């Protein structure tokens, strides 16, 4: 019987995005728990349940390089992001990092019609330890076409080989490279999802504290902010909704260089202490995400700081939904926050 269920799930997963939502409820009946007055989107929950739970938290550092390649291959094959309506061209730039001495890939996405002045610098997610420009390739093509803006996606160095603040310094190098290549910082927006959103916050704080030139706007998509895991959502959504707590602890541990990092505002965003405000900001949270509460807490800090911030919460969605626009609810949410982003970018 268990073998039949295994093959049945494999079959459903193969044809998942061709199955109408009404039929999916018949083929895969699931009970959803109401939490905080909401139930997770059915199609999203079905997709999560058909996929095996992550075991990333059990991976040893010496095996991580091999695991990264497997994850990248699987994500590229799965094609979870919708394709742009009009093909988006790309151009690879290899830039020098002054901080690390490394040569970094900065991939430029060029939509068919774009504003010649505005650009976005993007940092991908993956817990600072996995994923790449390639795994996010389809998502950024879709974003670029929808926004009609050129996007530069950075291949930053991953942890644990490169601990905090290595990737942050590379992110700063990429921002400065864009400015040095005749781009007015007033026309540059910075965006990231998950670990990449954490980098957006860190870089913005660093630039502000240095009195450096600032980007014109920020988009942070479900940022991790609290390495102490103090918020209620950590426990509420710990093991059923894509991002597992065990993986979350593992990610932070890979990034951390020493215990002092935990109280560094560049690492722990709930320790932000600047009185200056950020540029106009959009912060996205998902209701069924273990880190949604810390994202909301961080947004409150920015509000008190005087930042013009809009928090967009999608109460029936989960961590990483922006990567999965083939899911109907995820697509609607992405369109919604990108429409809001257009107003400030």
Please report, for each region that a protein language model flagged, where it lies by residue.
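A glycine/proline-hinged amphipathic helix-loop "lid/cap" segment
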Residues: 1-109
């Amino acid at each position: 019987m268990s073998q039949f269920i295994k093959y049945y799930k494999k079959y459903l997963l193969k044809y998942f995005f061709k199955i109408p939502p009404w039929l999916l409820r018949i083929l895969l009946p699931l009970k959803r728990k109401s939490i905080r007055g909401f139930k997770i989107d059915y199609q999203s929950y079905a997709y999560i349940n058909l996929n095996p739970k992550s075991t990333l938290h059990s991976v040893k550092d010496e095996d991580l390089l091999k695991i990264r390649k497997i994850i990248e291959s699987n994500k590229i094959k799965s094609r979870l992001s919708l394709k742009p309506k009009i093909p988006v061209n790309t151009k690879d730039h290899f830039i020098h990092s002054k901080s690390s001495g490394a040569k970094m890939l900065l991939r430029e996405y060029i939509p068919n019609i774009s504003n010649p002045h505005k650009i976005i610098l993007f940092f991908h997610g993956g817990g600072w330890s996995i994923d790449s420009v390639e795994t996010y390739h389809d998502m950024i093509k879709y974003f670029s076409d929808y926004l009609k803006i050129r996007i530069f996606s950075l291949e930053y160095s991953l942890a644990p080989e490169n601990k905090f603040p290595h990737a942050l310094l590379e992110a700063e190098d990429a921002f400065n490279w864009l400015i040095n290549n005749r781009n007015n910082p007033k026309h540059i927006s910075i965006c990231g999802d998950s670990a990449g959103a954490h980098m957006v916050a860190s870089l913005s704080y660093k630039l502000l504290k240095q009195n450096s030139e600032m980007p014109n706007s920020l988009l942070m998509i479900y940022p991790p902010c609290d390495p102490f895991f103090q918020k209620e959502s950590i426990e509420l959504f710990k093991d059923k909704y894509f991002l597992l707590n065990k993986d979350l602890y593992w990610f932070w541990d890979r990034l951390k260089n020493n215990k002092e990092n935990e109280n560094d505002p560049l690492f722990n965003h709930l320790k932000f202490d600047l009185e200056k405000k950020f540029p106009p900001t959009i912060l996205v949270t998902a209701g069924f995400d273990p880190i949604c509460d810390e994202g909301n807490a961080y947004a409150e800090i920015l509000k008190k700081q005087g930042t013009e911030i809009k928090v967009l919460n999608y109460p029936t969605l989960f961590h990483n939904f922006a990567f999965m626009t083939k899911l109907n609810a995820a697509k609607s949410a992405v369109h919604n926050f990108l429409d809001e982003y257009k107003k400030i970018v």
